[in-house]
């Protein structure tokens, strides 16, 4: 493949690929007709299901009404990779006879192109109810409309592990990626949000402060967290007591303050690890407050990702221990949609 072709954005490369498919198909048909006129010669016909293959991509002719998920399972190792095929074939209808481009290599992991770069918005919720009386509470019907919008408009609710791989330049993520997070550990996350998320095929990351878990009828339980984890949800730390990590309490000495924030950060990880049998790698700063000292302790405790509530998205070059999140407090759809910015336009030519 020519270097100039490889340097093009994926959509341009795939457009060029589709332009040559006609000629490839003519070659396949012509070869078959030619050899059919020479019956005395033993011939191995080209595969009827694969028009072209290189180390970079496959051009595949659909034999039936195969889906992108079925092709992803066959060529890319799992149905969850179907978005790669969908993004490589914009506007193509998956039906018998269609030629589909299947990228085999993970290119452009940073989400860069000449017009700008990819950003990943992180959406933050707290509790849910049928009727709400607080900005931190999201009505169930409104939350369902929001998830319905994400699904209908091609957004992918990625996992925290996918976000980490993107930030570490290990893995590409879908162009329209969002991470859904829920803070504190309210039971309504399990009773209301969880069924809605499953309905649309989404997962989320829960940040719990461990002293709250199971402490009242409003709190989620460890058994419920175990169930959600088995369903693909990620459980992260939000400290033990949800105290401000950036300032001393009244009457607290510097030594006492340092011991307290270390316990909040280290201790919560230890509790979650023991309760859920995992290595907790993601943390949300209580109230979204952080400073250089808390970042350093979070790093030393073994966390790979830590999140604030500073508004905005996260590019591949973002500090993984100071990521931005948008709290979804208003209930109207225009405001929600405005938080879904997945691309930052900036001329990189």
Residue ranges and their predicted role:
Residues 202-222:
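A short, conserved beta-to-alpha structural element at the edge of catalytic cores
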Residues 116, 194-201, 220-237:
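Acidic (Asp/Glu)-rich catalytic clusters
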Residues 40-55, 70, 77-115:
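Extracellular LysM carbohydrate-binding repeats and other cell-envelope/extracellular binding modules
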Residues 23-33:
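Bacterial N-terminal signal peptides
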Residues 107-181, 186-190, 242-349:
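C-terminal active-site subregion of NodB/CE4 polysaccharide deacetylases
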Residues 1-17:
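N-terminal secretory signal peptides that target proteins for export/translocation
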Residues 65-71:
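Extracytoplasmic Gram-positive cell-surface binding/anchoring modules and repeats
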């Amino acid at each position: 493949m020519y270097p100039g072709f490889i340097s093009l954005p994926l959509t341009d490369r795939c457009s060029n690929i589709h332009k040559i498919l006609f000629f490839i198909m003519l070659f396949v048909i012509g070869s078959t007709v030619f050899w059919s006129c020479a019956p005395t010669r033993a011939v191995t016909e080209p595969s009827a299901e694969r028009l072209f293959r290189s180390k970079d991509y496959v051009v595949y002719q659909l034999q039936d009404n195969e889906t992108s998920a079925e092709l992803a399972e066959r060529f890319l190792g799992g149905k969850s990779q179907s978005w790669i095929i969908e993004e490589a074939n914009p506007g193509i209808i998956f039906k018998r006879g269609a030629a589909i481009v299947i990228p085999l290599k993970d290119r452009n992991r940073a989400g860069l192109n000449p017009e700008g770069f990819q950003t990943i918005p992180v959406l933050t919720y707290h509790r849910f109810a049928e009727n709400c009386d607080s900005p931190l509470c999201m009505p169930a019907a409104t939350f369902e409309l929001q998830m319905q919008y994400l699904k209908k408009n091609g957004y992918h609710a990625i996992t925290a592990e996918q976000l980490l791989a993107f930030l570490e330049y290990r893995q590409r993520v879908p162009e329209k990626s969002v991470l859904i997070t829920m803070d504190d550990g309210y039971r309504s996350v399990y009773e209301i949000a969880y069924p809605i998320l499953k309905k649309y095929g989404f997962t989320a990351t829960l940040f719990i402060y461990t002293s709250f878990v199971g402490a009242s009828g409003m709190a989620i339980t460890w058994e419920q967290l175990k169930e959600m984890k088995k369903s693909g949800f990620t459980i992260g730390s939000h400290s033990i007591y949800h105290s401000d990590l950036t300032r001393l309490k009244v009457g607290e000495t510097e030594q006492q303050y340092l011991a307290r924030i270390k316990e909040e950060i280290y201790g919560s990880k230890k509790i979650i690890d023991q309760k859920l049998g995992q290595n907790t790698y993601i943390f949300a700063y209580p109230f979204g407050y952080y400073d250089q000292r808390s970042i350093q302790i979070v790093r030393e405790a073994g966390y790979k990702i830590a999140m604030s509530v500073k508004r905005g998205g996260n590019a591949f070059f973002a500090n993984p221990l100071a990521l931005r999140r948008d709290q979804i407090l208003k209930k109207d759809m225009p405001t929600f949609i405005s938080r879904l910015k997945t691309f930052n336009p900036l001329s990189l030519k």
